[in-house]
């Protein structure tokens, strides 16, 4: 089983950026669609229809969808080594009357008649430059959180209170899944954005239902509800039932113990690796992050430019070393530049830069890694040979798995990428092993990933 192009899109380390205010309106980023009060998608569409009528409103929205992000933007991203984008959308974005029936968006269904068609054209456009696309349900039924970016300004998160809302969101996920199968550059579907904290049982049930309607090859990205470690453990415990990826958002300007800390202290804390060291090799991405700090933080330094660069570099080091990738929030703003929220600003100011892939001249397994393999294999055999077992072991599968990890690591590099989700890749590889001892192959691969990580091979900034 070789590495195909779809595998490369899905399993590589994601150097990403969010395309905010495109299919899910956010006034502070782009106010083109707004004619009255409010800042959410619902207020944008209702105001536009009220001011211009349904047909002209549809023209306005379609003009925005077609022009906000174009091939020149994808070219800019590729030039700056972006290989994936995260596109926020809502259940209203799918151009399906049944999906908006009985919702606040039902009166405006005609505005969204062609939205999915345009979205698919843009997915294809991104694919022409080898950029992957993560489709993110910012807007779910009832609201996944109390913020306007969930689609309305109701201030309510009622998704968790009604089974109907959860089931309808699953139907929306299923419908979207049925429309994107032809695009090899779709890297996943995120089924909810920033769910509120504490809804563990509701979310676990919802995530499993959503997983069941998404094609097995495609990851289901899940919001962590501000409890990263809980959902990383949950995904690790459920990896045999399908490919999940935890979406964690990392901001230092909205709250938490570091919200008002000096930039130097925040950077030092990041550099310790305390926050993400426990998640290494797990299926997790930083779905949103920025270089924004509070005014109180910035007031505590006179070295603004240096601290800004140090902060950006420290974040990238953590997110790309310990996670499967990250997506900066957000790509651009309608009116000028958006400061430390603006990808173009921080790239052009050299605050952050995604790293080029490491060289691939040396394809032979390093002697130190071979030594680790042989030592681990000996320990593996000794341990399991002392145990009662119902069938003969196949210890050679352990070595086969270890060697396969190295070969796959090199193959990703040869395609200009680093592997981002090694545990999930191991699960995929296991499907080719028809043996009751396939677990030995799995353990060999995962042990190899662990040692590759320890030696720095999985860190794009500190690669040997």
Curated annotation (Swiss-Prot):
A single Gene Ontology CC term:
cytoplasm
Single GO MF descriptor: glucan exo-1,3-beta-glucosidase activity
UniProt keywords (A-Z) are: Cell wall biogenesis/degradation, Glycosidase, Hydrolase
Q: What InterPro entries does its record include?
A: Glycoside_hydrolase_SF, Glycosyl_hydrolase_5
Name its GO BP terms in alphabetical order: fungal-type cell wall beta-glucan metabolic process; fungal-type cell wall disassembly involved in conjugation with cellular fusion; glucan catabolic process
Does the record's keyword annotation contain DNA repair?
no
The family assignment reads:
Belongs to the glycosyl hydrolase 5 (cellulase A) family.
This one is known as Glucan 1,3-beta-glucosidase 3
């Amino acid at each position: 089983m070789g590495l195909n192009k779809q595998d490369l899109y899905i399993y590589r380390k994601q150097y990403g950026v969010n395309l905010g205010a495109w299919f899910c309106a956010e006034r502070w980023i782009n106010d083109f669609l707004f004619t009255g009060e409010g800042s959410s998608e619902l207020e944008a569409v209702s105001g536009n229809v009220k001011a211009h009528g349904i047909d002209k409103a549809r023209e306005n929205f379609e003009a925005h969808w077609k022009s906000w992000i174009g091939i020149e933007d994808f070219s800019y991203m590729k030039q700056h080594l972006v290989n994936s984008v995260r596109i926020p959308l809502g259940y209203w974005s799918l151009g399906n009357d049944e999906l908006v029936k009985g919702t606040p968006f039902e009166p405006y269904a005609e505005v969204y008649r062609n939205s999915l068609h345009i979205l698919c054209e843009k997915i294809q456009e991104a694919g022409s430059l080898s950029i992957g696309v993560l489709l993110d349900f910012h807007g779910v039924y009832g609201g996944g959180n109390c913020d306007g970016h969930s689609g309305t300004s109701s201030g309510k998160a009622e998704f968790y209170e009604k089974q109907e809302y959860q089931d309808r969101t699953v139907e929306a996920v299923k419908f979207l899944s049925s429309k994107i199968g032809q695009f090899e550059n779709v890297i996943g579907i995120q089924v909810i954005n920033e769910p509120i904290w504490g809804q563990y049982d509701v979310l676990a049930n919802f995530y499993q239902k959503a997983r069941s309607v998404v094609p097995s090859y495609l990851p289901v990205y899940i919001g962590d509800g501000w409890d990263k470690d809980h959902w990383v453990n949950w995904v690790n415990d459920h990896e045999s039932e399908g490919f999940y990826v935890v979406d964690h958002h990392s901001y230092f300007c909205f709250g938490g113990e570091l919200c008002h800390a000096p930039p130097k202290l925040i950077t030092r804390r990041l550099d310790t690796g305390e926050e993400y060291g426990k998640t290494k090799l797990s299926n997790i991405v930083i779905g949103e992050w920025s270089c924004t700090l509070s005014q109180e933080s910035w007031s505590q330094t006179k070295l603004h430019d240096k601290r800004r660069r140090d902060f950006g570099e420290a974040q990238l080091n953590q997110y790309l070393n310990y996670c499967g990738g990250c997506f900066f929030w957000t790509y651009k703003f309608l009116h000028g530049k958006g400061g430390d929220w603006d990808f173009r600003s921080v790239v052009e100011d050299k605050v952050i830069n995604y790293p080029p892939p490491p060289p691939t001249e040396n394809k032979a397994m390093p002697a130190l890694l071979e030594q680790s393999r042989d030592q681990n294999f000996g320990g593996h055999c000794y341990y399991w040979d002392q145990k009662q077992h119902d069938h003969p072991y196949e210890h050679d599968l352990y070595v086969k798995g270890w060697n396969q990890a190295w070969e796959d690591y090199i193959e990703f590099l040869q395609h200009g990428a680093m592997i981002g989700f090694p545990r999930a890749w191991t699960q995929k590889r296991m499907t080719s092993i028809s043996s009751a001892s396939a677990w030995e192959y799995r353990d060999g691969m995962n042990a190899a990933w662990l040692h590759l990580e320890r030696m720095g091979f999985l860190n794009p900034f500190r690669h040997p």
